[in-house]
């Protein structure tokens, strides 16, 4: 399988390139970056100390021309432009970008009628196992427990709460038969009154180089259960993303998530 990487000069992009180079059965077909990036024209492996023979380019269609799949962990506006080009050229996509609004998510669903797309809040196998644990815990602790989601990321993350935190909230809300749009509480300040027992709270921390910490607290009277996942590097995300690309090899179209890739549905 020939894989192209978007955001090739970024932290996640470099790790994805390295993962592709180290994975049997796949090859690096292209490396994409934004116009004006100082990395344009450089070998995609330069920052890894390796030569790939693939130059970083800002020409989306040229990069996709030799690719079977594009892996994209960038920003919503860039990803949506890449989706349009991928749909035109019949190139599949693995999307780890977070922060989409409802219109953006609808655009991904529409594109998935024509091409295979894996769109997930988190590509870590451990995080996806955590989603299943939360589903079970929410059903067992459906009454008498207050639910709070606490997440922490590095200072450069631009969206909050994280896509993973929101997915955790969705998993819990679905297990409880609730709608996260109506039961989520994203901020508390001043005189808030008593906590609504049916709400799901979110707290966000941003600082330093935290890769990603997520904890869900089920707080009852006399006890508290906490389910946590902490990432020490982005390696698990890169591994999962390449695994997702290979999953798409025989999928002509459709919208999938990491639970599909791992056979957890």
Curated annotation (Swiss-Prot):
The keyword tRNA-binding does not apply. Transmembrane segments: none annotated. One of its GO terms (molecular function) is oxidoreductase activity, acting on CH or CH2 groups, NAD or NADP as acceptor. Its EC number is 1.17.1.8. It is an enzyme of class 1 (oxidoreductase). It comes from the Bacteria. InterPro entries: DapB_C, DapB_N, DapB_N_CS, DHDPR_bac, NAD(P)-bd_dom_sf. Catalyzes the conversion of 4-hydroxy-tetrahydrodipicolinate (HTPA) to tetrahydrodipicolinate. NCBIfam families: dapB. This is 4-hydroxy-tetrahydrodipicolinate reductase.
């Amino acid at each position: 399988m020939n894989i192209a990487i978007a955001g090739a000069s970024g932290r996640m992009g470099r790790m994805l390139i390295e993962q592709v180079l180290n994975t049997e059965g796949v090859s690096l077909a292209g490396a994409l970056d934004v116009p004006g990036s100082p990395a344009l024209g450089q070998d995609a492996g330069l920052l890894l100390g390796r030569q790939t023979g693939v130059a970083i380019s800002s020409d989306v269609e040229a990069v996709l021309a030799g690719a079977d799949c594009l892996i994209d962990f960038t920003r919503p506006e860039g990803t949506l432009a890449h989706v349009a080009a991928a749909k035109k050229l019949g190139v599949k996509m693995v999307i780890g970008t977070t922060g989409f609004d409802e219109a953006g998510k609808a655009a991904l669903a529409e594109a998935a009628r024509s091409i295979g797309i894996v769109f997930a809040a988190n590509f870590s196998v451990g995080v996806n196992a955590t989603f299943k644990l939360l589903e079970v815990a929410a059903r067992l602790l459906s009454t008498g427990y207050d639910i709070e989601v606490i997440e922490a990321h590095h200072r450069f993350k631009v969206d909050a709460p994280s896509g993973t935190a929101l997915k955790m909230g969705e998993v819990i809300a679905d297990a409880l038969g609730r709608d996260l749009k109506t039961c989520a509480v994203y901020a508390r300040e001043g005189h808030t009154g008593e906590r609504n027992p049916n709400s799901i709270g979110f707290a966000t921390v941003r600082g330093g180089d935290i890769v990603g910490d997520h904890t869900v607290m089920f707080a009852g009277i006399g006890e508290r259960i906490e389910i946590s996942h902490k990432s020490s590097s982005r390696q698990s995300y890169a591994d999962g993303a390449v695994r997702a690309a290979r999953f798409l090899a025989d999928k002509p179209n459709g919208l999938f998530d990491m639970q599909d890739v791992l056979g957890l549905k």
